[in-house]
Amino acid sequence: MILITSGAEAEIYESENMIIKRRVKKNYRIDELDSMLNKTRTKREVNIIKKLNALNIPSPMFYTTNKYDIVMEKIKGIPVKNILNNESLTSNQFLNKICAKTHKDILIEIGNIVYAMHNNNIIHGDLTTLNFIYSDKIHIIDFGLSFYSNKDEDKAVDLYLFEKSLISVHNEEFVSYFYSGYIVNETLNKKLLEIRKRGRKRE
């Protein structure tokens, strides 16, 4: 296993076919509290991954877990961020498949995935194009901030943060492509407009 990422919340290890996500101990927290929080968050993340697998929403296949580790499938592909920015494509085995897809195709597919999640009351919590991987199809990854909610407020915040990510890292036009795959109903649209207005006031 090779350590590929070490963040504030977890360490990520990989082998050829597997990813292990290991939640890290926070020294500033009381041991009992730290253990309880890590177990709870690991359990919630596992539950969401298993739910996505059951719904056939493209995501890593869950393998096993213990108190602090999640073992899951390694999605072999390219971050969508790189594809949309035309980075690191020339030597990749997926180049021919990617070239057959337009940026609009990719964003529509992402819209379909996020819509399916929200339709099942799953909030991702960290929607960026780095958290979508293109292999044989687009997969969504990284559910450390994910949770369940049927509230339009939570879904609208998820969408708004992704809009901001698309505009800041890529192209404002990509937002409209995304919404070609994610159909916003009237009540959610009303809440999304409120969230955007609040966001503009803070900027």
UniProtKB/Swiss-Prot annotation:
Name the chemical reaction catalysed here: L-seryl-[protein] + ATP = O-phospho-L-seryl-[protein] + ADP + H(+); L-threonyl-[protein] + ATP = O-phospho-L-threonyl-[protein] + ADP + H(+)
Principal subcellular localization: cytoplasm
Keywords in alphabetical order? Activator, ATP-binding, Chromosome, Cytoplasm, Hydrolase, Kinase, Nucleotide-binding, Nucleus, Phosphoprotein, Serine/threonine-protein kinase, Telomere, Transcription, Transcription regulation, Transferase, tRNA processing
Q: Which InterPro entries does its entry note?
A: Bud32, Kinase-like_dom_sf, Prot_kinase_dom, RIO_dom, Tyr_kinase_AS
Q: Which residues bind ATP?
A: I4, T5, S6, G7, A8, E9, A10, E11, I12, K26
EC number(s) for this protein?
3.6.-.-, 2.7.11.1
Q: Which GO terms describe its biological process?
A: tRNA processing
Q: Name one GO cellular component term.
A: cytosol
Q: Show the active-site residues.
A: D126
Tell me where in this chain the Protein kinase domain is found. 1-203
Pfam families in the cross-refs: RIO1
Task: Extract one GO molecular function annotation from the record.
Answer: protein serine/threonine kinase activity
The compartments listed are:
Cytoplasm; Nucleus; Chromosome, Telomere
What binding partners and quaternary form does the record give? Component of the EKC/KEOPS complex composed of at least BUD32, CGI121, GON7, KAE1 and PCC1; the whole complex dimerizes.
What family is this protein classified in?
Belongs to the protein kinase superfamily. BUD32 family.
- Function noted in UniProt: Component of the EKC/KEOPS complex that is required for the formation of a threonylcarbamoyl group on adenosine at position 37 (t(6)A37) in tRNAs that read codons beginning with adenine. The complex is probably involved in the transfer of the threonylcarbamoyl moiety of threonylcarbamoyl-AMP (TC-AMP) to the N6 group of A37. BUD32 has ATPase activity in the context of the EKC/KEOPS complex and likely plays a supporting role to the catalytic subunit KAE1. The EKC/KEOPS complex also promotes both telomere uncapping and telomere elongation.
For domains, the record's comment is: This protein is considered an atypical serine/threonine kinase, because it lacks the conventional structural elements necessary for the substrate recognition as well as a lysine residue that in all other serine/threonine kinases participates in the catalytic event. BUD32 has protein kinase activity in vitro, but in the context of the EKC/KEOPS complex, the catalytic subunit KAE1 switches the activity of BUD32 from kinase into ATPase.
**What is the name of the protein in this document?**
EKC/KEOPS complex subunit BUD32
Organism (species): Enterocytozoon bieneusi (strain H348)
